[in-house]
């Protein structure tokens, strides 16, 4: 029906999954996706802030680039949510992605392809940099020493497709969905 067609269109617009063939529509979809991503990141940060744990440092959108506290030789993007646990001596860098839920096998394959070809290489590069530059995190938590470790979590709102496929390239990135941290936010430190 016309109503159902309209509702599908609205859903695709709000999810940022509508087919975009014009520059204006591409810009609109990009803005929708950026807004969704920012809101998701802020909500993950709030989840950890609301725990009110004195030993847990929480920050978001922490840039890794020349001239910033996490000073790197080149622009490496940002850590969406940075958690530093003083008790377990862990630095957890969360890459938060609010992908639309995959409903078909084709969408699962497409999501996996997007993660592998567009997202993961940047996350791995950032993870390697963070592991090699633990001392730079002292800007945020001065107590950081050589006993601290770093891990990166690729967090998606819905369960993501990546873990259901075999991949040629091994990496240290941990893949979680929000359901796994809402039940137990400290899951990221296990």
Regions found by a protein language model. Give the residues of each.
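Intrinsically disordered, low-complexity Ser/Thr/Pro/Gly-rich regulatory segments
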Residues: 1-190
């Amino acid at each position: 029906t016309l109503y159902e067609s309209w509702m599908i269109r609205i859903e695709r617009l709000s999810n940022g999954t509508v087919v975009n063939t014009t520059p204006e529509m591409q810009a609109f979809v990009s803005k929708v996706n950026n807004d969704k991503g920012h809101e998701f990141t802020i909500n993950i940060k709030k989840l950890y802030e609301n725990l009110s744990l004195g030993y847990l440092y929480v920050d978001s959108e922490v840039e890794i680039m020349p001239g910033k506290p996490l000073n790197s030789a080149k622009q490496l993007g940002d850590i969406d949510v940075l958690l530093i646990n003083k008790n377990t001596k862990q630095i957890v860098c969360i890459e938060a992605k609010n992908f639309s839920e995959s409903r078909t096998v084709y969408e699962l394959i497409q999501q996996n392809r997007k993660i592998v070809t567009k997202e993961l290489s940047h996350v791995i590069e950032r993870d390697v940099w963070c592991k090699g530059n633990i001392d730079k995190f002292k800007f945020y938590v001065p107590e950081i020493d050589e006993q601290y470790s770093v891990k990166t979590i690729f967090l998606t709102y819905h369960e993501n497709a990546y873990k259901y496929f075999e991949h040629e390239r091994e990496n240290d990135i941990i893949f979680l969905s929000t359901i796994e941290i809402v039940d137990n936010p400290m899951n990221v430190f296990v």
